[in-house]
Amino acid sequence: MKTNRQINRIRGLMDKYLEIVHSDRNKQNLKMWKEVGSWNRDKPRGFVPLKPNGHLPYVIELDISLWRKLTNDTNLVEYYSDPYTHMEFQLQRSLNHHQLYKDNFVFTDELYIWFGVITELSLFGSEVVWQEHKEGWIKEPILSSLEQVEKLTPPDFYKSGLMPKIHEFYQVMNEVADGKLKVLFPELARGPFCMAVHLRGISDLFCDVLVNPEGVHKLMRFIVDSEIEWTKERTRFTGEEPTRLKLFNDEIDCPSIGPQIYNDLIFPYEEELAKISGGVRYWHSCGNISAFLPKINKLPNLEVCHVGPWTSYEEADAIFGSKTALEICLHPVNDIVMADTGQMRSKLEDIINKCPHENYSVRADALMPQGDDLESQLSKIKEWEEIAREYFG
């Protein structure tokens, strides 16, 4: 049980944060995006960019492993286990972001509950290992063979995996927020293929794709049906309709898989979920998805597609045009931390020259601690921002 002093400290941070939310600078940043809807996890993204002042938006996002170093080395085990620390850290993180960077990040009057990319996997029985310095991860895959899919049971909205902790956080954070900030209940964001990879194990699943595709279809079917039912229960619990679909799929990468595998084993399930959800708000893979772009372009009402460092933004611009916005993410080491001024400038100019539809934002993301020289790394990020502000924002 936390003391009144600790709760008052959190509420003091809330007051400072709300000043940022209602600031003129934040209002100006809102104009840089077509719509800023609720984002039920960390790292808000998936927004369609606008160009109100002749410049497209850019965003800087440090990884949580780096943010913790800027908040007195917060122990992330505590952050993921204690709702008060969860609130305090994310508020302090936002205050630090506003102070450090002049990017087009938008602050909203909302708080999230987010335990990392393993959240959904825990619902299916994967055991989580927590770590002090970075996001938690899972132990071994729970499926030693595809025959075990028949024995899986759909996640219980209240009891499975991290759900009891999510409900605890939701209750406590709402009590502390006291109506000043809206606490968002999590939504499912991992794509079905991502889930399948980690429930079965990446090497085994890729072998299954070749020798037992029907078994893979059964696993995908189970995951999709489970996600649909979980989302229905979320609607009953919160009284809120789900937002448009988010599909995080870092495991979709070429040449790990080819276009035919995506077309046959993955796309049909993404399309099914998209039709139920009224479209796809955001499709994400950090892998090389250039070969999949023509098929991804056929997903209904796709608003934003992530274009990571290994995907051709030139091809993405040509394929999506003005229909779907691109979120172009730079390589955090090659394009920022280890880049010199000329390389930073050249990269941004290359994006501008090769994306004539001007339907994109630029994101410096996944910035993690690099060695012991933290000040030097932060200085390089600031240097990149100064250059980025000449072209964007």
Predicted regions located by residue number:
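Active-site loop segments of alpha/beta catalytic cores
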Residues: 1-76, 104-112, 117, 127-138, ...
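Surface-exposed strand-loop-strand hairpins of Gram-negative outer-membrane beta-barrel proteins
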Residues: 72-86
